């Protein structure tokens, strides 16, 4: 199947034009659209923060997320919000996590520092991870942390972070990642303990705080669990943030992938979700056209 192609003389896809001036798209207002910084900057496209923000504005997005704190002033200068911040850990940020008591001191300290920065800048969410399942995060030969032990440790750490975040009006969102795709370091994460949305949801349920929720990544959930719409309804009260990408491959939200995103977005509206939807796909072609298609597919 051939991928769809954008009009060659329309660099930014379907934004309306008034003379030679690009005009911001008006959206329906039921979905709060966000662009993930790393997908456009830390990949082959290497877009600057200004270009990402300009595209976000023109597409009718309200946020650019996951940019480092030193770039937040640029995001705000463009009239955008930052829906989600990183946890302050060195790359890969998901390797050393809350499932391993050995890393608790570092992870909790760094995450608390990000909570403070987020609170000071009106950023509502900070990401969290279970981490890899090995005793030494980077060493598969070091022995595995049992899933029950990893869950207990994550509950303990997440509860402390939620208590710290609550008076600062920040929410910690725990992300499930898939462990099946080993084709690319950002398409799948073999060894990550929290690879099951049911496992992560139970952790959040046990923490029992409005400031600890799920980051429901449709791409990862579809690969590991499937039954996306049923799980959105099942875990509605615990969902704090949404990520989307094409399945499989983490590419565009086009007709070469299997998720019908308009139905997913309508489900979010039906369950009363009012958070952000972050476009976190890795472009395989002209990002301008791919982003325009993705936002259009998700604007219900």
Regions found by a protein language model. Give the residues of each.
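Cysteine-centered motifs
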Residues: 7-10
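Leucine-biased recognition of intrinsically disordered, low-complexity hydrophobic segments
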Residues: 12-15, 22
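Short, well-ordered beta-to-alpha junction loops that form the rim of enzyme active sites
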Residues: 129-131, 176-178, 218
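Structural motif corresponding to the early beta-alpha repeats
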Residues: 39, 54, 59-160, 167, ...
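Non-cysteine beta-strand/loop elements that form the S-adenosyl-L-methionine
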Residues: 81-88, 128, 175, 236-246
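Hydrophobic, aromatic-enriched interface-forming segments
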Residues: 161-185
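Histidine-acidic metal/acid-base catalytic patches
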Residues: 21-60, 65, 122-124, 135-145, ...
């Amino acid at each position: 199947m051939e991928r769809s192609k954008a009009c060659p003389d329309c660099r930014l896809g379907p934004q309306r034009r008034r003379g030679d001036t690009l005009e911001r798209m008006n959206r329906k207002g039921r979905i709060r659209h966000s662009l993930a910084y790393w997908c456009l900057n830390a990949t082959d496209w290497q877009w600057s923060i200004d270009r990402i923000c300009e595209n976000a504005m023109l597409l009718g997005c309200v946020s650019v997320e996951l940019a480092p704190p030193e770039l937040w002033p640029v995001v705000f200068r463009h009239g955008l919000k930052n829906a989600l911040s990183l946890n302050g850990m060195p790359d890969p940020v998901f390797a050393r996590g809350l499932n391993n008591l050995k890393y608790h001191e570092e992870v909790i300290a760094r995450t608390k520092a990000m909570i403070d920065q987020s609170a000071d800048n009106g950023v509502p969410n900070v990401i969290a991870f279970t981490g890899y399942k090995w005793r030494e995060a980077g060493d598969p030969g070091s022995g595995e942390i049992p899933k029950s032990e990893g869950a207990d440790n994550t509950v303990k750490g997440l509860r402390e972070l939620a208590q710290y975040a609550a008076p600062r009006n920040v929410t910690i969102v725990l992300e499930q990642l898939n462990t099946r795709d080993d084709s690319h370091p950002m398409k799948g994460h073999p060894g990550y303990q929290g690879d099951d949305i049911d496992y992560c949801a139970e952790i959040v349920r046990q923490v029992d705080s409005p400031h600890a929720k799920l980051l429901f990544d449709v791409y990862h959930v579809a690969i590991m669990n499937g039954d996306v719409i049923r799980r959105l309804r099942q875990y509605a009260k615990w969902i704090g943030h949404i990520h989307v990408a094409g399945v499989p491959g983490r590419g565009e939200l086009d007709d070469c992938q299997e998720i019908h995103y308009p139905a997913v977005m309508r489900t979010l509206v039906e369950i009363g979700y009012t958070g952000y939807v972050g476009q976190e796909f890795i472009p395989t072609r002209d990002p301008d056209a791919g982003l325009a298609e993705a936002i259009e597919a998700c604007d219900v």
